[in-house]
Amino acid sequence: MDLSGCGTALITPFRADESIDEPALRALVDWQIASGIDWLVACGTTAETPTLTHDEWLRVIRIIAEQAAGRVPVWAGCTHNATRQAVENARQAAQIPGVTAILVANPYYNKPTQQGLYEHFLAVARAVELPVVLYNIPSRTGCNLEPETVLRLVGAAPNIAAIKESSSNLPQIGELLTRAPESFRVYSGDDNMALGTIALGGAGLVSVASNEIPREMAEMVRAAVQNDWALARQLHRKYFPLLQANFLETSPGPVKAVLAMMGRIEERYRLPMTPVSSATRARLERLAGELGLLVETPVPQR
């Protein structure tokens, strides 16, 4: 999978009745692409995917892939903590026109061994022909996908093409980049670790902040990939306070709050996600104002 740059892990906008806000989602896709984002991720962590029904999960992927219309690649998040269901999810997502890769995180809650992780990901990879992107996010899943296991998987399934590394463990990322084949892509899954990952040989970033600042994050990552480190550092320093503030509370709470301030979505969540606190909201509003993000954008008509 020859893909470098910045992809966005899209949020899922909801209405007051908690239904999916399809016009807002389609508008977000168009804005992301017009802003220079290199690919989109449907139904990842930032999308509140565990709160979606299976039919809603399929619908969100279809909407994003349909609206992207081949302009950028689309990765479909197919994570499940039951391997059988993860396999079925991957098979269903792979049939959606416009889906170009399958993203699968470690099974959450189960806390499998490395052998369990190996067999889980291998089963998913063998069920589809599309490239499979591993997704290591121990803080959410309760288990870490170790480099040795990744290397075993790469050797066993040729369509395991990449990993989204959200462990925030730079030595682990460095080990993986040192030992993996050059064709295997490593993407940072952490905005704050993007430049470090790219400096070690990573291919780019799957970003949360690019929901709010797609053009700026795409420019920062592109600069790093092209070895323009002066520009990359300049942009990172400018937007670092926002990258930090996005995790003052559980994501995507802060990101959705900022997008609502920008007029791009209604600020709606599904429990157990709740609106951010008044203190967090005040800090986000101040940062968004300082960064010039509060230009009014009408929420798409329904």
From Swiss-Prot:
Binding residues annotated for pyruvate, in chain numbering: 46, 206
Alphabetically ordered keywords of this record: Amino-acid biosynthesis, Cytoplasm, Diaminopimelate biosynthesis, Lyase, Lysine biosynthesis, Schiff base
EC numbers: 4.3.3.7
Catalyzed chemical reaction(s): L-aspartate 4-semialdehyde + pyruvate = (2S,4S)-4-hydroxy-2,3,4,5-tetrahydrodipicolinate + H2O + H(+)
Site positions for Part of a proton relay during catalysis: 45, 109
Compartmental location: Cytoplasm
Catalytic residues in the record: 135, 164
Molecular-function annotations in GO: 4-hydroxy-tetrahydrodipicolinate synthase activity
Broad class of enzyme this protein falls into: lyase
GO biological process, one term: diaminopimelate biosynthetic process
Function recorded in the entry: Catalyzes the condensation of (S)-aspartate-beta-semialdehyde [(S)-ASA] and pyruvate to 4-hydroxy-tetrahydrodipicolinate (HTPA).
UniProt record similarity statement: Belongs to the DapA family.
Name listed for the protein in its UniProt record: 4-hydroxy-tetrahydrodipicolinate synthase
Gene source species: Acidobacterium capsulatum (strain ATCC 51196 / DSM 11244 / BCRC 80197 / JCM 7670 / NBRC 15755 / NCIMB 13165 / 161)
Gene name of this polypeptide: dapA
